[in-house]
A protein has these predicted regions:
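Short beta-strand immediately N-terminal to the catalytic nucleophile in serine-hydrolase-like folds
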Residues: 1-3, 139
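Short beta-strand/loop motif that positions the catalytic acidic residue
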Residues: 132, 138-140
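Glycine/threonine-rich phosphate-binding loop and adjacent beta-strand/alpha-helix elements that clamp
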Residues: 165-166, 194, 206-478
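Short glycine-enriched nucleophile-adjacent loop
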Residues: 8-19, 348
Length: 478
């Protein structure tokens, strides 16, 4: 079996059933846990995915199947293009949205199941790896919305797949772009993988050829090379024996400021271990207000679908960084190239005036010419701070809590002269549904409160991003 997206789900659902004639699977751009990392992310509803995908990919097909005319389908598509971005995503409550009842009623099931429960467990790939006895050629892209689950599928199959053949034969191929390409800038060249990877996999497991596939590289990773100026970057492929790559080192960069890190014009600093006690950065915290009626707009990122209305991928962040509800922490220019390859994690301390709220972190590359681009971003809901599979627990207002957040996976060169930047806020809309800050069910209510947020970064509450650094990975000479 082969193909991607929804057809990737089909493969992951079929393989645990062990159909007798299934020899191998090759799923692409699809995750593992369809609750966390798909319809929800750390407890937050993936609003854009959950509305744009049914509106564009499911409902037109269902209309044709129901006997509706091309004119009716065209009228629907016009309705979507006129209303999805400007109207539908703003409607509250989420459960009151009425456009999908006839042809995409599963949307309301998604909204009705914000917690991981039996609804999600029955389709959860991440619990079924021991039942899968065939190898998987797993592929994805760094700007795909399901890349966290893609990597998890590879890791799960390699470690606990249901047969030696499944464990030893599973491979990972990660390219550059989004779910169906993307319109982002900068670009990163042609990330088409070597076609022999697939052919050798198929020849070995479908035809039974003794072609030495077992000795081929385990992972193939496309490394992004951003430009120093302009919007034309490049990239190159590397191989390895695992993901993360053996020999990966972790470098922590700490959030600091003089107490006014709001906007990219503020005094936020991202400092390495050697500079974390610099007396210039003595302010213990930064503050901002999060208003659900004026959320931070989504600018690029790992999204699906309808990139015409909401572009995905790498985009310049400099305009949105002028908002006062975004804290911005920037390093000094890097003295040499740094290969960041692996899983990026963040640990931070936060307080809120609300019983529940969200926090977002974004990793940004600042180019020497002043342009920027997002590398990774992620969100976490306060009530799910201990994990999306555990019972949600509201926070006590104005009390500090530690959050750990996996931003995702990447392979990029942070080039000499570039700066590392971290943005902290509480929304990315309409990528994610807004937390209304009331502590009530965000999916079935519409009352909103403004939350007063504090990010702590003193000695007792260190907040930092952890970057996976791989030595000796350099940009090939042209």
């Amino acid at each position: 079996m082969t193909s991607g997206s929804y057809l990737g789900i089909v493969q992951w659902q079929a393989a645990p059933l062990r159909p007798p004639h299934l020899a191998a699977i090759a799923p692409s751009v699809m995750g593992s846990d369809y609750h966390d990392g798909n319809v929800y992310v750390n407890g937050v509803f993936s609003l854009w995915l959950s509305q744009s995908w049914p509106a564009g990919a499911i409902i037109p097909d269902q209309m044709f199947r129901a006997g509706q005319s091309s004119a009716q389908v065209n009228a629907w598509n016009t309705l979507v293009n006129e209303n999805l971005f400007t109207n539908w995503v703003w409607q509250l409550p989420l459960s009151g949205f009425s456009e999908f009842h006839q042809f995409a009623s599963f949307y309301y099931d998604w909204v009705a199941h914000p917690n991981y429960d039996a609804y999600w467990a029955k389709i959860d790939t991440s619990t079924r790896y021991p039942d899968i006895t065939v190898p998987a050629l797993v592929s994805g892209d760094w700007y795909d919305p399901f890349q966290v689950g893609t990597v998890q599928n590879f890791q799960g199959m390699r470690s606990i797949g249901g047969s030696a053949k499944a464990r030893q034969g599973t491979r990972l191929v990660m390219g550059a772009y989004g779910h169906s390409g993307d319109s982002g800038t900068p670009t990163f060249g042609d990330d088409t993988p070597d076609p022999s990877i697939q052919m050798r996999f198929y020849d070995h497991y479908l035809k039974g050829l003794d072609n030495g596939f077992e000795s081929d590289p385990i992972v193939h990773l496309y490394v992004l090379v951003p430009p120093n100026s302009g919007n034309t970057g490049s990239g190159f492929w590397i191989t390895g024996d695992d993901f993360p790559l053996p020999g990966t080192q972790i470098a922590n960069y700490f959030l600091h400021s003089g107490g006014h890190a709001n906007t990219r014009l503020g005094d936020g600093v991202l400092a390495g271990d050697e500079d974390r006690h610099d007396p210039r950065y003595r302010a213990p915290a930064d503050r901002f207000d999060y208003d659900p009626e004026d959320p931070v707009p989504t600018v690029g990122g790992n999204m699906c679908c309808n990139g015409v209305l909401l572009p995905a991928g790498a985009l310049d962040q400099s305009a949105v960084e002028l908002r006062n509800d975004i804290l911005v922490y920037t390093s000094t220019p890097l003295p040499h190239d740094v290969a960041v390859i692996g899983t990026v994690n963040a640990t931070f301390w936060a307080m809120t005036s609300a019983r529940d709220t969200d926090f977002t972190l974004k990793l940004v590359d600042v180019h020497p010419d002043g342009l920027t681009h997002n590398v990774l971003d992620r969100i976490v809901r306060a009530r799910f701070r201990e994990g999306s599979r555990l019972p949600p627990e509201l926070v006590e207002p104005n009390q500090p809590y530690q959050y750990t957040l996996e931003l995702g996976n990447t392979a990029t060169i942070l080039r000499a002269g570039h700066q590392i930047r971290v943005e902290v806020s509480s929304s990315s809309f309409p990528h994610y549904a807004r937390n209304l800050n009331t502590g009530l069910d965000n999916n079935s209510t519409e009352a909103v409160l403004v939350a007063h947020q504090t990010i702590l970064h003193d000695k007792e509450h260190p907040s930092f991003i952890a970057l996976p650094i791989v030595p000796n990975v350099t940009i090939p000479s042209s």
